[in-house]
Every structure is written in structure tokens, then in C-alpha cells.
Amino acid sequence: MFLAQEIIRKKRDGHALSDEEIRFFINGIRDNTISEGQIAALAMTIFFHDMTMPERVSLTMAMRDSGTVLDWKSLHLNGPIVDKHSTGGVGDVTSLMLGPMVAACGGYIPMISGRGLGHTGGTLDKLESIPGFDIFPDDNRFREIIKDVGVAIIGQTSSLAPADKRFYATRDITATVDSIPLITASILAKKLAEGLDALVMDVKVGSGAFMPTYELSEALAEAIVGVANGAGVRTTALLTDMNQVLASSAGNAVEVREAVQFLTGEYRNPRLFDVTMALCVEMLTSGKLAKDDAEARAKLQAVLDNGKAAEVFGRMVAAQKGPTDFVENYAKYLPTAMLTKAVYADTEGFVSEMDTRALGMAVVAMGGGRRQASDTIDYSVGFTDMARLGDQVDGQRPLAVIHAKDENSWQEAAKAVKAAIKLADKAPESTPTVYRRISE
């Protein structure tokens, strides 16, 4: 039998906690036998003293085991259970293509996703712009979709990692969110509860990233790879660029439109293609669906070219109660904004810098995201035809096309876009889309 205050004292004094102590504390968070004050105190001691790798693994596993852990054995699937997690960005619509692409290559992707957070868009919010799309199928239906289609994208239910929900709520109001061991455990508790064979992490770097510096993004990626492998799940991470909007669009319905166009081959933004492909390659090689990167790329290109990936996306939408002909007729189903108009720069020049975070917040301000949990989302608003770093803009080439609910909202968004995009006399050096791959 442990005492919560003794566990806090031990960590406060700089000592490592045992697996049993960590499990006792996390189970107490779940069972409400540990108070909010005690959660806050432990979070702050971890913030200042960090955690050893064994402590990090124990914390992650204890949080995972605080709820249901999915088990796929009874389905006798003929491929690996794999997933991807992104730390979030703007125009980061990779999940919508990646899930179907990997499923079309023989993987199974039980993707449990989130809503928008701060300036970053949420995969669930994007999918809910599709009429009827059900992000909370019951457990049996979820398993059926995985078995039949190969991919489902759903919301987190209360039975998955419940200790994380309470722990995070306390961290949020006590300035302990940005602690690498706590972020790692929070991300992985939910992902590892999916019962995965392999995981790839997409850790963003730059002005629209969750972590403020390259070094911190790198430290987070290394921590996640170390802990997830320590927990028995083959995991790699890619550090990818978020110094500009990743897709050509940012919003909800506008990003779903771009995802369908990507899958059908109608239009593929080159940077979005690079990042999506790199993540899919990791999933295929880690999941043993391809012997090397070259074979993985060839398989992925084939399912894009022969239409299989688009077909899987359509089947997923239909299985989750969306329209059965969504891929063919997406324009008919997706909501459109009242006012669609381009915004131009005041001077000519090359796009040299982009405050991606500010652009994400501009989408939220238009109604495309939530400022508080109770807010309703306007799925139709956002940006399309976004200028990229190095593009020459003038009276002919806009900075973006703004989809707004009215003139007032358009004016505010136009102001935000102009402030967020800096111009120069010459094009900047091009930045890589993938900076580094991290493996164990």
C-alpha cells in the first residue's frame, strides 16, 4: 500500500519512482482516490525533475492500462495493425489519405483521432464536414469496419486511457502541459491502447508546430520512439516541416475536398505528397508489408494510380454512415461558404516567411475551430489555393482564397493572412519537408 504524498515527496526529492508506485498513482487518478492537488503536485515535480526511461515507460503503460486495450486476435486479420500520430499542424490532412493508402496495401489502421486543439485542425472535425459521418461507432461496428474495410477513423471513447483525460485537464490549468515525459505518456497511452504492431510519429517542426523549437521537437520525437519501443511497439518518427501550411488548403470541408482530389489524382500538393508518402513508407516497412523503402513506395504509388486507395476511402466513409458515392460526388455533399474571394498582397514579391500558427488561428476566428469545447464549427470556412514559401505573388497570384461566412469575417481573415505572410525581393532557400528520421 502506497501513500500518494510519499510518492510525490520521493519525486520532489529527485528520486526515480518504481513501476508499482506509478501504477498506484495512475489508478488513483482513474478511480478518483487521488485529488486534483496531488495530481498537480506530481505533474510539477515531473516537470522539474524529468523522468528516467523506465519511469517514462511505466507511466505510459499505466495510463494505457487505466482503460480498455483493444485486442484484434479474434478477428484473425491477415496483416499488421499500424497507425500514425501527428503532433498537429495547419493543413495537415495526411490521415485522410494515409489510412486508405496503407489499408489498400494490406495494413489495418484503427485510427483514434482528436478534435482541433488551439491553432491545429482536428481530423474528426474535418470528417464531420461529411454529412452523416459517424465518428463514434460502437465497439462491434468499429471492429467490423476494420475487418471489412481495413481503416476506420473514430473519436476517443471514455473507456480508452481514462486516467489521461483527468491528468491532462489538471496539467492544462497548472502550467505543466509542456513536459516531455508527460506529453509522451499522454500521446502514447491513447495510441498504444489501439493494440498496435507498429506506429509512426509525425513530429512537426517550425512556426506552426506544437513544440516551439527544432531541438524540443527532436527531443519529443526521441522520447516517443524510446518509450513506444520500450512498451513493445515498433515505432519510428519523422520530423516534418510546419513552417508553412502543409496542404493547399486549411479548414474542414476544404481539406476533405483536397484529400479526395489527392486520392483520385485530380490534384496533389507536392509537399503534402512528400510527407504523406514518407509516413506511409514508414508504416509499410515497420509493419513488414514491404522489405524496404523502394518496395513500399512502389506499392503505395500503385494503389494511388489504380484507384484502390480512393476506393478504400469511399468504403470507409460509407461504412461510417456517410454518403455511399462521396468520392464521386464530394462537391455535392461538402458545405460551401457564403463568400469565396481571393486576398492579394499589397506589394509584389516572393513569399519568404509564414506564421503558420497565426493562419491556423485565423481559421478558428472565422468559425472553423473551437475556442472552447462547447463552440459549434462552421465546416465551410477556411483557406484554399494557399501561396507557398518561394512563390511569387502579385496582382495576379493571390496569397490565398478565403472562404468566409460574410464580408466582415472575410475582411478580418484577409487582415490576418496579410500579417502572417512576409514577402521579400528574392525567393528564400527551400526547406526540406522531412528533416530527420528517428528510430531506436
Curated annotation (Swiss-Prot):
Involved pathway(s): Pyrimidine metabolism; dTMP biosynthesis via salvage pathway; dTMP from thymine: step 1/2
Enzyme class: transferase
Protein name: Thymidine phosphorylase
Protein task: The enzymes which catalyze the reversible phosphorolysis of pyrimidine nucleosides are involved in the degradation of these compounds and in their utilization as carbon and energy sources, or in the rescue of pyrimidine bases for nucleotide synthesis.
Gene designation: deoA
Substrates-to-products reaction catalysed: thymidine + phosphate = 2-deoxy-alpha-D-ribose 1-phosphate + thymine
Annotated SMART domains: PYNP_C
Swiss-Prot/TrEMBL keywords: Glycosyltransferase, Transferase
Keyword Transferase on entry: yes
EC number: 2.4.2.4
A single cellular component GO annotation: cytosol
One annotated GO molecular function: 1,4-alpha-oligoglucan phosphorylase activity
Domain of life of the native organism: Bacteria
Subunit structure: Homodimer.
Listed HAMAP family: Thymid_phosp
Species, as recorded: Escherichia fergusonii (strain ATCC 35469 / DSM 13698 / CCUG 18766 / IAM 14443 / JCM 21226 / LMG 7866 / NBRC 102419 / NCTC 12128 / CDC 0568-73)
GO biological process: pyrimidine nucleobase metabolic process; thymidine metabolic process
Protein family (similarity comment): Belongs to the thymidine/pyrimidine-nucleoside phosphorylase family.
